[in-house]
Amino acid sequence: MRLIESIREMTAWSREQAREGRTIGFVPTMGYLHEGHLTLMRRAREACDRVVVSIFVNPLQFGAGEDFAEYPRDLIRDSRLAESAGVDVLFAPSAREMYPKGYHTFVDVERLTEGLCGASRPGHFRGVTTVVCKLFNIVRPDVAYFGQKDAQQLAVIRRMTEDLNLPVSVVGVPIVREADGLAMSSRNVYLSPQERQAALVLSRALARARELIEGGERDVARLRQIITETITAEPLAAIDYVSIVDNRFIQPVETLAGECLIALAVRIGKRRLIDNMVVEV
């Protein structure tokens, strides 16, 4: 596996692959890899001739008071894991490389970013779309893989890719969970044992909602009420949002119909965790 840290070298490598007719699968990450990331890499490995993974803790998507400085970083560990998943190139640029002095350009997707995480994290998605657009232009992948756990992010990136005519196929991959149901996240390492146990309330609330839907419940207000009651029964949990939206446009719905997204953001202690479930009725 090759480690690349400069944009020029990364772009030159990608151009060489294109000249030789090889397809590139791309998995953008912020590092501190876990099984969810490795699942994306394996999907890319199965489908593409070459696999590139980026590791970049993007300062643009962190707001004031968020965990940019303490976000877990371990490039040696991540390199070992990426290589074990069959990755060809690990692209790990510095912030100075990505955003040199005088940088003033941003990508902003409207409407889809107004609710859910966009409401409580202003500027977050502008940071996400800016860095992903830059990475697409640098790596020049044929296919890019994203986890469904960040469902709003996935919808926003698909919208950006379509609107800007970027020649990349965006593939969403189902959430990877721990054996007890907790959605895998790099931020799970922050949790104390007690908080780790409390965090299971997210997947438990979604499972309760699924039971109700399978029993015929279609009223969104009723579903939100049950989810909220389930979460608030956990003393360490504080709800940021419980939302049920159309899965494509991320707009609120009153009745379940078609493909909908049930999305949660909950603080467990000091840590903000997200989870979601897509339902089709």
Curated annotation (Swiss-Prot):
Pfam families: Pantoate_ligase (PF02569). (R)-pantoate binds at Q61, Q153. It is found in: Cytoplasm. Homodimer. Its EC number is 6.3.2.1. Catalyzes the condensation of pantoate with beta-alanine in an ATP-dependent reaction via a pantoyl-adenylate intermediate. Pathway: Cofactor biosynthesis; (R)-pantothenate biosynthesis; (R)-pantothenate from (R)-pantoate and beta-alanine: step 1/1. It comes from Heliobacterium modesticaldum (strain ATCC 51547 / Ice1). Gene3D superfamilies: HUPs (3.40.50.620), Pantoate-beta-alanine ligase, C-terminal domain (3.30.1300.10). Belongs to the pantothenate synthetase family. Beta-alanine binds at Q61. Signal peptide: none annotated. GO terms for molecular function: ATP binding; pantoate-beta-alanine ligase activity. This is Pantothenate synthetase. One of its GO terms (cellular component) is cytosol.
